Amino acid sequence: LKENNFLVWKDQVEDFELRVKFRLEGGNSGIYYHAQKRRPGPTQGDPLTGTQADFDASGRWTGVIMEYLLRDVLAERGQKVVIDEQGKKQVVGSVGDPAELLKAVKAGDWNESTVIARGGHVVLKINGVIMCELEDRDPKRLVHGWLAVQVHIGPPMRVQFKDIYLRRL
């Protein structure tokens, strides 16, 4: 791949609960939400931008909420984060030890990612275990957009998705 590829759902979402089963062999993938199309021109490998519930074979990015090419990592695995009205990020607590949380993920097997987004509050779970939690009060945050699943550029990989469930809140 020359740039990241996406399968994009036809409708946009704002407040929602999304459950997706995924299986990943190698590489990096994720679920974009509140995604926006990038402007024409160099995209640095990504035709979409948006908030992402990330996962990868190495485990480095699994259970992380980020905005690729925007505000970068918003909440690492294990963190409770508040982003204030001025866009300042502060870790305010923990949902668990990052290494212990990663043990909930079944490498190379089917896992279920759950994203619950209501207003600026986002909870990311994998296999029912909370990976991180974000309270984003920044008025510039993305509040609506498309849902998309990603195939990231990089080494050979295989990612599969099934049993996609969306509930608008």
Q: Where are the language model's segments positioned?
A:
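Carbohydrate-interacting regions of secretory-pathway proteins
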Residues: 1-169
